[in-house]
From Swiss-Prot:
<feature type="binding site">
    <location>
        <position position="123"/>
    </location>
    <ligand>
        <name>FAD</name>
    </ligand>
</feature>
<feature type="binding site">
    <location>
        <position position="34"/>
    </location>
    <ligand>
        <name>FAD</name>
    </ligand>
</feature>
<dbReference type="GO" id="GO:0016628">
    <property type="term" value="F:oxidoreductase activity, acting on the CH-CH group of donors, NAD or NADP as acceptor"/>
</dbReference>
<dbReference type="Pfam" id="PF22578">
    <property type="entry name" value="GGR_cat"/>
</dbReference>
<comment type="function">
    <text>Is involved in the reduction of 2,3-digeranylgeranylglycerophospholipids (unsaturated archaeols) into 2,3-diphytanylglycerophospholipids (saturated archaeols) in the biosynthesis of archaeal membrane lipids. Catalyzes the formation of archaetidic acid (2,3-di-O-phytanyl-sn-glyceryl phosphate) from 2,3-di-O-geranylgeranylglyceryl phosphate (DGGGP) via the hydrogenation of each double bond of the isoprenoid chains.</text>
</comment>
<keyword id="KW-0594">Phospholipid biosynthesis</keyword>
<feature type="binding site">
    <location>
        <position position="45"/>
    </location>
    <ligand>
        <name>FAD</name>
    </ligand>
</feature>
<dbReference type="InterPro" id="IPR054715">
    <property type="entry name" value="GGR_cat"/>
</dbReference>
<comment type="pathway">
    <text>Membrane lipid metabolism; glycerophospholipid metabolism.</text>
</comment>
<keyword id="KW-0444">Lipid biosynthesis</keyword>
<dbReference type="Pfam" id="PF12831">
    <property type="entry name" value="FAD_oxidored"/>
</dbReference>
<dbReference type="GO" id="GO:0045550">
    <property type="term" value="F:geranylgeranyl reductase activity"/>
</dbReference>
<comment type="similarity">
    <text>Belongs to the geranylgeranyl reductase family. DGGGPL reductase subfamily.</text>
</comment>
<dbReference type="InterPro" id="IPR036188">
    <property type="entry name" value="FAD/NAD-bd_sf"/>
</dbReference>
<dbReference type="InterPro" id="IPR050407">
    <property type="entry name" value="Geranylgeranyl_reductase"/>
</dbReference>
<dbReference type="GO" id="GO:0016636">
    <property type="term" value="F:oxidoreductase activity, acting on the CH-CH group of donors, iron-sulfur protein as acceptor"/>
</dbReference>
<keyword id="KW-0443">Lipid metabolism</keyword>
Amino acid sequence: MKDKYDVLVIGAGPAGSIAAKTAAEKGLDVLLIEKRQEIGDPVRCAEGVNKECLKKHVEIDKRWICADLKGSCIFSPDGTKIEMAEEISGGEVGYVLERKVFDRALAEHAATAGAEVRVKTRATGLIIEDDFVKGARLMHLGKEYEVRASIVIGADGVESKVGRWAGIDTALKPVDVETCAQYLIAGADINQEYCEFYIGNEMAPGGYVWVFPKGGGKANVGIGILGSKMGKFKPRPVDYLNDFVQKKFPDARIVEMVFGGVPVSGSIEKTSVNGLMLVGDAARQSDPITGGGILNAMDAGKLAGEAAYEAISAGDVSVVKLEEVYEKKWRDTVGHDIDMSLIVKNCFINLTDDDLDSLAHSLKDVKFERMSLLDLLQALFKANKKLLWDLRVLFKDAAKEVIKNKT
């Protein structure tokens, strides 16, 4: 490990690896570090991702594909089922990944592009001089290093320390984080062609239960519960999950279990300072509805890698420059989708189970494989006029997209 690089990327998840790969492909000298000894472990997500969006970043490799889904099914509290084709099921439906293999493959791609990759290497602080981030202090195999870099990219996940060290407010309120529990189960009778989502305040307050098939009778079964819906004397997410698994998959065996938090806050005020950018969960770039963040992380990582090249080439790594080449670009793309999802989340978290059932009853006969904006508006208006009014900004934006695509 040298003491000077063009770019130092802290965290080798999808955001960090794509950022490192992109910057290295531009000819920059890049160091990508990961605090754990194995990239991709532990897995902390359902592992679902949209096919076409994924193909923008990588060639599909069967080694890290567990399942190829046709679509998704959403179940309301009374069991009403809404079936949607894969194309309109959102960013988490399409392929189910083997994240341990996938994340390592992304890091390998970064290394192939020319980045130096170091595992079991932890950042312990930033080097800040004259209000500019100049690098970081690292710990590797018990030895301390000072590594300087023209740009630091913080991709250290939901527990990010890099942002806090840089003076960026990434604090999450209870309403801004979902506490999650997930089991990998085996030996269960599971539909291997569709992922399933279960909603309801009795089942998952302020969140949902997910079932993502992984082939061979295996599936990721998990739950996310909004922090504001939890309390000292209320059941824990794992208690809700145990109840669901016992009822839905009584013969299943638990093979793995993971626990963690997912940011669902929407965009934070800033994600860059002099000499530093945040990406992925560290920048709170996950979807506020689903908590899914793989694709957003990869999109933002690519933008950050490109921004690092532009800023370094211009000899200007100031926050003003980084806002121009990174902040504005991700907010106009990834950030726009996050903002729209936040509107929906804030409307739906206050719905009762009766409201959710009413919506499901109105939507169950809609042909989602060819659903138009008008179809959805009519169904929502029939089910809940107040909800439609609360979502008016979202539909106004969607209508603009329809008009733009037709011109």
